[in-house]
Regions:
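Acidic, metal/ion-coordinating pockets
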Residues: 1-387
Length: 387
């Protein structure tokens, strides 16, 4: 369990940086329930920050949010797929009040197995007795019963896997069509009323259930392309704490994940619940610095977790529109999670030229599936790309 928050005045720093539009739709939106989400919305609005992807009800969470500038109007349609069912907003009806929360893009997965492995798992299900449990629970709860080609493996009520028969083994992911269409309709509306439409999705998910895979899962790729078809100027993925590749679709960029702007774990003033301390084997009266310093290094002093791999280099995207034509350039940033001074770890600085060159090569490799090529321009100090 990972529950965390910061004090409302932390948002003053975003306001001081003139960050105007912020998506608050993510897997922590309702860590402290619907009231926590409502408190966040009100704290942002009090500071002139426009909260995107969240609302006092589902209709508000799904709506585009706008910023008018001297150069034109920008719209943001924001949503989240990661654990979205835990935090989705709800509209009122005759019986219940509206519930604050996020704009969800819910999704599901099935584990597809060839005949031999499918039958093996079905036999194991019978040996465990969970097949009989599922049949009885399904009858009482009026669920669809198992079929010859699909069944749920595990506990009927406390977690199970959807198993399907197929020609090969793979993870089949699929999107909630109603959620997707509602988001696309918001994008169509925004495109009619703005000069630039940014569709953004908070998504940790990767291929084959791996949050740290190079590529996004199929449902994210398909959704991103549909946002462009609906009128988005670009699609921005965020959530995974490292950069994923870029696809150019119908002339518009899909940034599958920018990475992180900040990862100020050790020096940050996070507020952490007792349950989260327990998850990391600490007492409930521990300090945030206890938790985060333990996550930074192993007992033998070697770097661990976010400090041990590819999480330092991330990037910003500069969007420039001239004569109704949009151009994009990538500006790599270095969070340097291994700085000697732990107070500086996770704070962004512009990457040096050599790191920018290396990052252009990394993005080209991470975008191989899409055929996008990146090149570092020393005169501009940024990375350009074509698809």
């Amino acid at each position: 369990m990972y529950l965390t928050s910061v004090r409302p005045e932390t948002l003053d720093e975003l306001a001081d940086l003139n960050i105007n539009l912020v998506s608050f739709a993510n897997n922590h939106t309702t860590d402290y329930g619907p009231q926590g989400c409502l408190d966040t919305i009100e704290a942002a609005e009090a500071r002139g920050i426009i909260p995107c992807g969240v609302g006092r009800n589902l209709m508000e969470a799904r709506k585009a949010r706008f910023l008018d500038t001297a150069q034109g109007r920008v719209a943001v349609v924001a949503c989240s797929s990661t654990w979205a069912e835990r935090a989705l907003a709800s509209n009122a009806n005759a019986d219940v009040s509206a519930r604050p929360g996020l704009c969800p893009l819910r999704w599901g997965r099935s584990y597809v197995l060839p005949d031999e492995q499918f039958e093996q798992l079905r036999k194991i299900d019978a040996m465990l007795g969970t097949d009989k449990s599922l049949k009885e629970v399904s009858k009482i709860e009026t669920w669809d019963p198992p079929t010859d080609n699909a069944f749920k493996f595990g506990s009927p009520m406390n977690g199970n896997l959807q198993i399907e028969r197929g020609k090969r083994a793979y993870v089949r992911d699929y999107v909630n069509e109603a959620d997707q269409e509602a988001i696309l309709e918001s994008i169509r509306d925004a495109a009619r009323r703005s000069d630039v439409v940014i569709a953004t999705l908070h998504t940790h998910e990767g291929e084959n259930e791996n949050w740290y895979a190079t590529y996004a899962p199929r449902f994210v790729e398909e959704f991103a392309r549909k946002t462009i078809e609906a009128g988005a100027t670009c699609f921005v993925g965020q959530g995974a704490h490292f950069p994923r590749g870029v696809e150019v679709y119908k002339g518009c960029p899909i940034f599958y994940n920018l990475g992180s702007l900040l990862m100020e774990f050790e020096a940050g003033e996070s507020m952490i619940s007792p349950e989260m301390y327990e998850t990391y084997h600490l007492s409930s009266d521990a300090y945030p610095s206890d938790l985060h310093s333990n996550r930074a290094k192993k007992p033998d002093g070697t770097w661990n977790g976010f400090y041990s791999e590819r999480f330092s280099t991330n990037y910003l995207v500069a969007l420039d529109i001239e004569e109704e034509k949009a151009t994009y350039s990538i500006v790599p940033i270095d969070l340097d999670m291994r700085r000697e001074n732990n107070l500086e770890r996770g704070l962004p600085v512009i990457s040096d030229p050599e790191e920018r060159r290396k990052f252009a090569e990394y993005l080209t490799e991470a975008s191989e599936r899409y055929g996008t090529v990146f090149a570092y321009r020393e005169d501009a100090g940024s990375i350009l790309f074509n698809g």
